[in-house]
């Protein structure tokens, strides 16, 4: 049986099937269509302008390595006129980040791009190894996500760049859409599918995004005044990125973070992979669903906050103290749970705490003596300003229960 020919060039032998389109094509045609699609994403969304200084978030993994390679190739092929830099964050994870940084340093030599490395230790005085020893593995991703985004902004400010590009791919975006739906965070659905984000509310991840602390012309910092973030791989499938790295023989680090196996995102990822196996277009379908969902004006208004500089570090924030400083305060005080969770959940914890304070009850006994009792009132889960039960509408049960024997 004769080998199948590439459906694009109809000359070379087909060596792979594209996960995105199921086309059987040769290596060279795969490289061409992959790079052309990324170029189309960049051009159609006006991601850059000539003369931009662009920092590539480099972790040494497949996504950032392929992104660095493609950005260099496309910048030269289509004459974007960009000044490219590699920006890497050292979270301080022994046996993981130290090894991946060696890959980043090799990439720097291979692509001849300037490299800037910033570490959690120098920025915050805590490495992720230190944080995990203090908080355990349950909520460590919260700390890492907040610290990493701020570190990227600070690194970008140090490099004087206009734009940060990250290797978030179509799978990542679809996972984030699913996570926001599962958590009922409808307000974030509208912006998690944006290819360009800027300022405190421009998070592509599942954590709160805040800006950068260096002063800008508007007085609220670089994160709110100029540094953009974009995802050139927003429509690129993860499987195709892996195939590109494999056939191009790119040098990348493939070990998963040792602290992330129990991350909430992992469950969304597993579900997405199951959907993709049944229907490959599910990834793009989910992204388009997130883009097409209409968020009510009430929800939009509830998410609007006035930006200001953190009183402690100067980082732009929607609160007087930024999330990173709150988390650091918890670590320093030995109360690492401080700042973890949503604002709503923290308010509930505050109500629990207030209602669980010890109170003193004074009564007079039959013989005229004063008796003091100390007790902790039981928390009922009802806020102080909750309406009385009698004012609430009666909702009949949906199902009748037969208690007869």
Curated annotation (Swiss-Prot):
Pathway membership: tRNA modification; 5-methoxycarbonylmethyl-2-thiouridine-tRNA biosynthesis
Localization terms from the record: Cytoplasm
Stretches for region Disordered: 197-217
Major site of localization recorded for this protein: cytoplasm
Enzyme class: transferase
Entries under PROSITE patterns matching the protein: UPF0021
Keywords in alphabetical order: Cytoplasm, RNA-binding, Transferase, tRNA processing, tRNA-binding
Any one of the GO BP annotations: tRNA wobble position uridine thiolation
InterPro entries xrefs: CTU1-like_ATP-bd, CTU1_C, Ncs6/Tuc1/Ctu1, Rossmann-like_a/b/a_fold, TilS/TtcA_N, tRNA_thiolation_TtcA_Ctu1, UPF0021_CS
GO CC annotations, alphabetized: cytosol; cytosolic tRNA wobble base thiouridylase complex; peroxisome
One Pfam family in the UniProt entry: ATP_bind_3
Entry's EC annotation: 2.7.7.-
NCBIfam families: TIGR00269 family protein
Protein name stated in the entry: Cytoplasmic tRNA 2-thiolation protein 1
Organism: Mycosarcoma maydis
Name of the gene this protein is made from: NCS6
